[in-house]
């Protein structure tokens, strides 16, 4: 009984101290929409994106609960010889929630196609990390006419035997999800971010602050809860339809999506090659942009 009381008290303390209201979008834009940030209207959404460099186009899609800022290291290096476009996906960053709540990978791939049309893109290389990788390979199946190459960085989307992380299960819960939508202590977010790095000492407080503040943008947490409730769609059965050169990058210390799933992507996509990034975790492109982008540069030079 005493342990139960202590547990209940601890829960109340977390709930009381962890409550965080949504952040005002305009205040966040004033802080984070600095050059070269732009906005474009796409299917009812005011989309935050960055477009830099000249040459063959590379479109990069970030992971869940992240933003275009996770690609900044890659973008700076790739833009020396390429046009590099990054964006905040619906329910993320400064773009904010989709009024129609379209967060399934296939739906976000269609949004991405509308975005590409708004920017009048032709054919391009598409890359994505985690959730963004899931969207990227869906896009390659749904719109093969536009895809020149595919880059998957610790990508999601394959059926997994391991249980989903506790945080994901809580967010998807019909009981606890609405509570967690408002209770988001910074220390829990910081802990989750550390778990995405092969070497957690590389994670800076500035990155934690940025990701945390953008996560609190009005509507983003509710969008995350909706997204986590999405089930698998079986589209992985069509991975064999992807015939463009494909680079599968995986941090060998990824504990979020294990490296064996990189092997599975390599085996199931006809022209795929796998490159393991030594010592890096789930957010390899952010943890070490120079090391992780090197195989990408070789792919683009072919």
Where are these regions (language model features)?
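Conserved alpha/beta-hydrolase catalytic His-Asp/Glu region
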Residues: 162-164, 182-241
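Short beta-strand/loop motif that positions the catalytic acidic residue
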Residues: 242, 248-250
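Conserved HGGG/HGGXW glycine-rich cap/lid loop of the alpha/beta-hydrolase fold
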Residues: 45, 51-94
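Flexible "cap/lid" loop of the alpha/beta hydrolase fold
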Residues: 137, 141, 149-178
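Catalytic active-site module of serine/aspartate enzymes centered on a nucleophile-bearing elbow/loop
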Residues: 272-302
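Alpha/beta-hydrolase fold catalytic core
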Residues: 1-56, 80-82, 121-122, 301-302
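Acidic catalytic loop of the alpha/beta-hydrolase fold
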Residues: 253-257
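Active-site loop/oxyanion-hole signature of alpha/beta-hydrolase fold enzymes
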Residues: 36, 42-43, 50-52, 89-131, ...
């Amino acid at each position: 009984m005493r342990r139960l009381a202590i547990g209940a008290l601890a829960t109340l303390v977390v709930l009381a101290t962890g409550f965080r209201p949504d952040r005002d979008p305009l205040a966040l834009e004033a802080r984070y929409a600095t050059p070269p940030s732009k906005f474009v209207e796409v299917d009812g959404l005011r989309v935050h994106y960055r477009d830099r460099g000249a040459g063959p186009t590379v479109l990069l899609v970030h992971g869940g609960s992240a933003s275009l800022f996770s690609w900044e290291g890659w973008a700076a290096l790739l833009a020396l010889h390429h046009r590099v476009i990054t964006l905040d996906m619906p329910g993320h960053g400064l773009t904010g929630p989709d009024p129609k709540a379209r967060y399934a990978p296939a739906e976000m791939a269609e949004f991405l196609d509308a975005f590409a049309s708004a920017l009048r893109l032709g054919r391009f290389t598409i890359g994505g990390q985690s959730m963004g990788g899931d969207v990227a390979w869906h896009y390659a199946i749904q719109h093969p006419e536009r895809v020149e190459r595919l880059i998957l960085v610790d990508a999601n989307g394959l059926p997994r035997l391991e249980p989903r992380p506790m945080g994901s299960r809580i967010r998807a819960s019909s009981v606890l999800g609405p509570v967690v939508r408002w209770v988001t202590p910074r220390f829990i977010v910081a802990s989750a971010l550390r778990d995405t790095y092969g070497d957690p000492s590389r994670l800076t407080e500035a990155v934690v602050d940025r990701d945390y503040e953008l996560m609190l943008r009005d509507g983003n947490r509710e969008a995350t809860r909706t997204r986590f409730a999405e089930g698998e769609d079986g589209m992985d059965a069509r991975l064999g339809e992807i015939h463009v050169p494909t680079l599968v990058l995986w941090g060998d210390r990824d504990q979020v999506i294990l490296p064996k799933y990189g092997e599975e992507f390599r085996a199931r996509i006809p022209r795929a090659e796998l490159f393991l990034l030594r010592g890096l975790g789930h957010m390899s492109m952010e943890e070490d942009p120079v090391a992780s982008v090197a195989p990408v540069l070789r792919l683009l030079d072919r």
